[in-house]
Regions:
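A short, Lys/Arg-rich alpha-helix, primarily the initiator
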Residues: 1-20
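DNA major-groove recognition helix of helix-turn-helix
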Residues: 14, 39, 49
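Helix-turn-helix DNA-binding elements, focusing on the entry/boundary residues of the two helices
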Residues: 21, 32, 50
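Short alpha-helical "recognition helix" segments of helix-turn-helix
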Residues: 24-25
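Recognition helix of helix-turn-helix/homeodomain-like DNA-binding domains
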Residues: 30-44
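Short, charged recognition helix plus adjacent turn
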Residues: 32, 47, 63-72
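Short, basic-rich loop-to-helix N-cap that marks the start of a DNA-contacting helix
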Residues: 42-55
Length: 72
């Protein structure tokens, strides 16, 4: 099972909050390059990072922010 960011939803959330992807990367304590990889789906957030994302975007549910894909 792989978990991906719902990049379109996260972009909408950031626009509503008048925040940038770089702002979120800073809040998550990750590099902007890693944030870009998460957003384009080439990297997958760890359980710990998913928790930090949820904590920084608390008005959103897990299913709003992440998509689960079965491997195989």
């Amino acid at each position: 099972m792989k978990v991906y960011l719902r990049n379109k939803e996260i972009k909408k959330i950031l626009i509503r909050k008048n925040k940038s992807q770089n702002w979120l990367a800073h809040r998550l304590e990750i590099s902007t390059g890693y944030m870009s990889q998460l957003m384009d789906g080439s990297r997958h957030p760890s359980p710990q990072l998913r928790e930090r994302i949820m904590n920084n975007l608390p008005e959103n549910k897990f299913d709003d922010l992440f998509q689960i894909q079965d491997e195989g």
